[in-house]
Amino acid sequence: MNKLEQEASNWMKERYKDMKLQDYQEKAAEFAIYPNTHAITYPALGLAGEAGEVANKVKKFIRDGADRESFEVKKTEIAAEIGDVLWYCAALANDLGFELSALAAANLNKLQGRKDRGKIS
């Protein structure tokens, strides 16, 4: 990451450090520019594509290995793809009428139930 990118990254971290999922979902909706006839389908396909990009970056990291400096670069690239995954999750949740915070809470509840039943350790 060059100096300008680092400064921009630090600015963004400071500006949004206390952001809640609901705030993110509302702000992300401003960028959901696709035909309403493709609501649900468009973000679902985008989510699959971006998740694939995360997997591909991790695969290349495993294949190529990395020294400490390139590890930080690859980590930043993976983080950017995770951000894209988050955007598509927010768009899909909006199109389905769900709040990300409610989905996150329901997911944690489900995971806790699995842990309590000894299904995950």
Label the model's feature ranges:
Residues 1-121:
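Flexible "arm" and connector segments at domain edges
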